[in-house]
Structures are given as C-alpha cells and as structure tokens.
C-alpha cells in the first residue's frame, strides 16, 4: 500500500522500519521539528527522521498541523492509501483524518479502552499493573476513541521500568501495524467499538517525580521509581542535596517505628535502606547531585550517609 507515516520517537521508528521492510511504498514521513538538546543545546533529529534520512524518504516537519493549509494540501496531493500514526505527538485535525482511502491507523501503547492519552505505558507501570499491551485502531476526532483493529497483551514484570516495557511494546506495535495493514489490504480488518469503560493516561507532570515519603507507601514509591525511569527519574533531598532514585525494591515490614524517609542502614556492603510507609525501600541504583547514576554500593563507597538521617 501507499503510506504516509507520522511519528517521532524510537517507539515510532520501530513501526516505520517494520512497514518499510514489509515492502509498502512510503510516500512521506511526517515527524516533529528538530529540537535543541543537551548542555550545548544542539539541534537533534527524531529517531523517525534519522531512519527516513537513511532510506532517502521524503520528510515533512511542520511546527503545527491545525490550519496548516499548505501542509494538508501537500498530503492530499500525495494521495496515500492509508496514514499510519505512531507516537507522533500532535493532535490531528479532521482534514488529515479524512485524506486517505482507509483513514488514519494508530498504534497505541495500551489495551484500549484503558489508558487513552499521551502516556499509556508510563501510567500502567506507575499504577503497578501486571499487564499491558498494544492496540491498533482507526483514528477519529476523539482522544484514542476510534474502533479497534488488533490487540496484543504482555505481562509487566514486578521490577520492569517504563523504559523496558516501552522497548517491548515498540516491537509488538511494529509487528501489529504490519499485520493490521495486511488485513486492511485484503479486507479482513475488524472494527471493534471500544465501549464506555475507559481510563485516561494524561501527560506526566514534573512535580510527580518528588517522593512523598509520608503519603505514599513503599510499593507506591517503587512503582513511582519504575514508572519515571528513564523519563525523568524520582528524587528526594538529603541534607539539602538532591538525590535521584533509579531502581529500588521493597521489603515488607509494617512494624517499624520512626519517621518515613529515615535511613535505617547505609554501608557499601549491605546497601541503603530507608523507612517508608508499610515497608522498607532498598535502593539499588542512585544518582547524587551533579553526578552520574551508579549502583548503590559504588555510591556509598564515595558518599557517607548517616544512619538516622532523613530524606525529605
């Protein structure tokens, strides 16, 4: 089929590569504009753009799409059979949704209708879900409300991070998109309404990343650390210094006295243990202020933490 592909991060790049390798004719690739990144604020291309450049595909990088008559007319002129949308990062106007013969097909990182919205993978991990998956769907003007086509489910390991689940789902999403295009092409693709029992996955707020030792229990803190790894990480302050937590585990214990956030043990042999509500946080990977992330044993060899000190 003749395809216009819209996507931006590595999650989308996996799908673009799969569609390309399946032999479809990719008429154009639409991705976000290059953005400044890092200390030098150097302009960086998206993973989707990098792949498109490597394969000499036509690239569009509109700053906005809504009311962008020139861009919309150019896509109309290309006359795609279908538009594939994977983690593009912008809401598409009705004019785009109606351009192609088969409409716009989306790869969404959840088992719809659960976790509609911008951050489905992150919220599944943040909430401690034991399963998630990928859904392909026909797009409509709502927020991930279109009829579903295919689904595939996976388990979320108790220690898996958002980054690890993201990587798994990107590969599953790529495979499902190719299968979806095949079914659309031969006329066997189903249209399954989502129903009304849905949940939302809004964009993440940076304020979420500070650990609330008093109001979150140990399991919730672990899920927070998992869910925000590697996007932003979670943090707390110790003696006025910002400490980031990248991996932790939980030891269940409801009988500890003392304030939550208090250091119970800290040495390079045994590690770092912090009192939390309904349990103990065992730190596995950590990052000091203005330092690199490292395992807790290496961190404690160069940084002394006093027993009884408190994370705030």
Predicted segments — roles?
Residues 222-312:
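C-terminal active-site/capping subdomain that shapes the small-molecule cofactor and substrate pocket
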Residues 1-232, 241, 279-282, 288, ...:
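One-carbon transfer enzymes
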């Amino acid at each position: 089929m003749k395809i216009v592909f819209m996507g931006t991060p590595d999650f989308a790049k996996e799908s673009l590569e799969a569609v390309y390798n399946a032999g479809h004719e990719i008429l154009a690739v639409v991705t976000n504009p290059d953005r400044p990144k890092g200390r030098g604020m150097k302009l960086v291309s998206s993973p989707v753009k990098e792949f498109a450049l490597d394969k000499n595909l036509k690239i569009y990088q509109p700053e906005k799409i809504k009311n962008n008559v020139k861009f919309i007319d150019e896509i109309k002129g290309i006359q795609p059979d279908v538009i594939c949308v994977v983690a593009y990062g912008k809401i598409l106007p009705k004019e785009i949704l109606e351009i192609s013969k088969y409409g716009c097909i989306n790869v969404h990182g959840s088992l719809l209708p659960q976790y509609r919205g911008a951050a489905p993978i992150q919220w599944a991990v943040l909430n401690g879900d034991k399963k998630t998956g990928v859904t392909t769907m026909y797009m409509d003007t709502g927020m991930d409300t279109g009829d579903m086509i295919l689904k595939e489910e996976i388990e979320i390991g108790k220690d898996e991070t958002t980054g690890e689940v993201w990587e798994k789902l990107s590969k599953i999403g790529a495979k499902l998109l190719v299968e979806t295009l095949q079914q659309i092409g031969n006329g066997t693709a189903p249209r399954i309404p989502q129903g009304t029992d849905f949940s939302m996955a809004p964009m993440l707020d940076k304020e979420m990343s500070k650990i609330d030792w008093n109001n979150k229990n140990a399991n919730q803190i672990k899920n927070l650390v998992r869910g925000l790894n590697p996007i932003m990480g979670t943090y707390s302050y110790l003696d006025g210094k910002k400490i980031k937590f990248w991996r932790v585990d939980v030891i269940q214990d409801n009988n500890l006295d003392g304030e939550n956030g208090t250091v119970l043990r800290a040495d390079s042999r045994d590690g770092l243990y912090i009192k939390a509500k309904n349990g103990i946080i065992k730190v596995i990977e950590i990052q000091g202020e203005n330092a690199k992330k490292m395992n807790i044993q290496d961190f404690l060899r160069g940084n002394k933490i006093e027993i009884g000190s408190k994370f705030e």
